[in-house]
Amino acid sequence: MGAPKQRWTSEEEAALRAGIARHGVGKWRTILKDPEFSSTLCYRSNVDLKDKWRNMNVIVSTSSSRDKAKSALKRIRTIPKNNEHTMAITRVTSDIDDEIVDEKPIVSLPSEAKNTSSSKKSHRLDNIIMEAIKNLNEPTGSHRTTIANYIEEQYWPPSDFDHLLSAKLKDLSTSGKLIKVNRKYRIAPSSPNSERRSPKMPLLEDVQREPVKIWSDDTKTLTRSQVDAELARMATMTAEEASVAAARAVAEAEAIMAEAEAAAKEAEAAEAEAQAAQAFAEAAFLTLKNRNAGKLVIALIHASLCYILPCFISYHI
């Protein structure tokens, strides 16, 4: 058994550090032979120096890590607590020194803030819809499907986007920002009285903008000037005159519907006649085909008799 190991003294550790600083790590024999350190390290071998140096490095690294952890823990404890809102502490580990990044609180929004955010989202959806209709720039307006396809190509809509789009288009049409004609939407013309306009005003504007057909006996299409004159005359009508004009328009509409029904009946009758004629033609074709087949059979029988009978008679004679 060798001699028991003795604890390292502070003088020996100081001599070891000075020797490494002078000669470098791994030069254990050189350090032991150095006259300045040989007297202090006379009871140590090169293996002892190597082990001690390794242990000293481990102790130093462990203590530094503990110091960093303690400082980080103190930093976390010094963060003020918020009783009204919840805090989320995000720790990011660094490969260099394992520092802790400053925490950012994730604050739960109150009901007023949520309402504000929802109103902002609704306003943003309004702007997106108006932008889509403006960029599509279709003369007669854009269909809901066309608007949805444009928004889906430009943005990332939510899962319930179709429902939101339908509701928002309805709201915009009711408020007068959009005009709906034949399931198509277009932006209403801006005017100073747009805010005071009733929900039914877009229909009147549509009558002014679109080519209007006034049905009469000759069914003619009025021009823009004629439409303006007619609208001006309607604006100056009394209640009695307006009721008479409405009754006349209803009567004209009923007459047009009656004419349409009569035309539909005539079309059905013509279609029935065409089907009957086609059936007659098919029957005649089948009859002619069967008749030609019968004639062909008779001709074959006659030809066979003309050939067989002379042969039979000559054989018996």
Swiss-Prot record:
Gene Ontology MF term list: double-stranded telomeric DNA binding; protein homodimerization activity; single-stranded telomeric DNA binding
Where in this chain does the entry annotate a coiled-coil region? 244-288
Residues of the HTH myb-type domain: 1-61
Specify the species: Zea mays (Maize)
Family of the protein in this entry: Belongs to the histone H1/H5 family. SMH subfamily.
Please explain the role this protein plays, according to its UniProt record: Binds preferentially double-stranded telomeric repeats, but may also bind to the single telomeric strand.
Name under which the protein is recorded: Single myb histone 6
Localization per record? Nucleus; Chromosome; Nucleus, Nucleolus; Chromosome, Telomere
